Amino acid sequence: MRYLTITLTLLLALTISLGNRSQAAAGEIQDKLSAESTIETVLKRGVLRVGMSTFVPWAMKDKTGQLIGFEIDVATRLAEDMGVEVEFVPTKWAGIIPALLTGKFDVIIGGMGILPSRNLKVNFSQPYDYTGMSMVAHKELAKGFSTLEDFNKPGVTIAARLGGTPVEAAKKHLPNAQLRLFDDESQTIQELLNGRVHAVVASAPMPAFQALKYPEKLFVPLPENFTREPIGFALRKGDVDTLNFFNNWIGFVEAEGWLKERKHYWFKTKDWEDQLQ
């Protein structure tokens, strides 16, 4: 009986010891995860670093050189709600995901489409916007063109921004056309205005804005967008705390109507156009 009591006592002590060790290990893991969380890092730093690339009307420079646009408003509001400053890190689109993964900034807020190929490299928040691919074309070179089939020919040249979803859309829907890639969309529009390409594939509503800006040279050949894609924040994998916060924040600003109001201002009106350079 005495041996049984001793044995049970030892087993109980061992169980308590193992339990304490497990709790300590769990605590260490939690502390490590918390310490590595982008949210915790941003709060300690006091600055949210946002990777982005300029394209109308998501992000662009006004007459004073300051960044304005839908994504600029979104990132600024996000930082304000976190109680920190925002720092924008302009980055070429083709290298923006590698820059995120190497810690150049904390999050990509730049109209990034949620694609399976991208999701293998980064995590995405829930969508906070939806967009689609459209085209703006040269009036003389693309005279009479009104369908994708008109542009899907070997003699047609299409321009798109390097590294963006327009490239994937052009390859999928216009496989027979010649595709020229550029670092940013301003270059694609300049090539179009110079008559060196038939059309530019880009996210709506940029093509419509360019056609309104240069009505003597450009037009929108398609009656509606030919793709639809969700837009989300991109962040590094494995950071559940940051992903949770971003998702809840998006839900909050959607519920209060702020996102809808900002979308209307930047995508449905031209009240901001006189701010541009």
Feature locations, PLM:
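Beta->alpha turn/N-cap motifs
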Residues: 51-56, 89-94, 103, 107-115, ...
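Bilobed "Venus flytrap"/periplasmic-binding protein-like clamshell domains
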Residues: 49-57, 67-80, 134-184, 199, ...
